[in-house]
Amino acid sequence: EIIAVTDGLGRPFQTVTKSTQTGTVKERLATLQEYDAMGRETKMWLPTPVTADYVTAAALKNTAKGSTGYSDTRPYSETVYEASPLDRVTKQYGAGAAWYSGHPVATDYLTNTVSGVLSCKLYTTDGNTLDDNGGELYAAGMLQMVKTTDEDGNASYTFTDKQERTVLTRQMNGTEQLDTYFVYDAKGNLCFVLQPEYQKTADLSLYAFQYKYDNRNRCTWKKLPGAE
């Protein structure tokens, strides 16, 4: 049995899950959802044992932090947003004080440059052949980028064009860049997916997914890396 409680604005606030096994004392686990002043979800408290179908937020928090809960000062996950009307997430913390100290998932919103890890090669295609344009790069500021840094400090980048298509995902392995490029034709059809090894050995037959389309943009041919 699940009891869902909403706040004055109709948002999910507290959920209590009750055991329905007959002949036993019904156990209850409650979760709590908190919101910031802008109405955005911020803290989600871990399921906590309670003794009633509804408990106040203060009582649930005290129980969660105490010895009958998690014995932890931060038994909740937390989402932090940038100070802008875009409501974009900048950090996400896992539950537990140990994760809060230097272990968030951090998100940065950037644009591309013409050098270093923020640069992106410009591949084009007529639908049949791939053109690397002599190693040309996208001009600075032409692509939107999202940099994600995980709990262990590993960074990855996603580059999107003005049509909101992903053109590159870059996973960092130390200082090594592992790049996967996505190449579209003039109609927006995905024609090539270049695997990271392609940047070392430009062999489409070994290191690329290839697709072809008819005049109705239906995929009529596909080739996997290494397939004959």
Regions found by a protein language model. Name each.
Residues 1-228:
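Beta-strand elements of repeat-based all-beta scaffolds
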